[in-house]
Design a protein with these regions (language model features):
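Ligand-binding "clamshell"
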Residues: 1, 35-37, 123, 135-150
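Short, low-complexity, polar/charged sequence segments that are solvent-exposed and flexible
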Residues: 10-14, 72-78, 108, 145-149
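Extracytoplasmic small-molecule ligand-binding "clamshell" domains
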Residues: 19, 23, 39-41, 46-131, ...
Length: 158
């Protein structure tokens, strides 16, 4: 599945990734208010006959993922949480991957320290939660290519 997801991620242009992040930063300020604009990353595939992709995330790390009380701006229901929805950069990327795979998407909220265990146990299929590969994590799970690249740095006086 890693190679397939990498192929899907490779179809997302840098400009679209940047536009999506800018959009999510803006939307995270008032997530329950419908901005009335299309999400920057969209799939044209509406076929969900290949099953369900179960994704884990914290739903608490804006602009990557957050919890809201409406389905505004492309948010998806959080499985097992009545009237709560997830949105953010990670959610929109997960929606795109699921659509391109021909699958429905289910989002599950986990504490950060429980994400890898959720994949290992089979409770979910994957994590989209801004998690970077480390040697320890790579012993436990497989990683796709990066779906977000940051140029954040520390600024120091010369």
């Amino acid at each position: 599945m890693v190679a397939t997801v990498n192929d899907i991620l490779a179809t997302i242009p840098t400009e679209t990734r940047q536009a999506l992040m800018a959009q999510m930063v803006s939307l995270s300020a008032n997530p329950d208010t419908d901005a009335g604009e299309a999400i920057a990353l969209q799939s044209s595939n509406t076929d969900t006959s290949n099953g369900t992709l179960r994704i884990a995330m914290e739903c608490a790390y804006a602009p990557f993922n957050w919890t809201q009380t409406t389905d505004a701006n492309g948010a998806v229901p959080i499985s097992g949480k009545d009237n709560l929805y997830a949105s953010g950069y990670d959610v929109q990327v997960a929606k795109y991957i699921a659509a391109e795979l021909g699958m429905a998407l289910e989002v599950y909220s986990y504490e950060w320290d429980s994400l890898i265990a959720a994949v290992q146990s089979g409770a979910v299929d994957a994590i989209t939660a801004g998690m970077s590969p480390t040697a320890e994590r790579e012993e436990q799970v497989d990683f796709t290519d990066c779906y977000y690249n940051s140029n954040l740095v520390v600024i120091i006086k010369k």
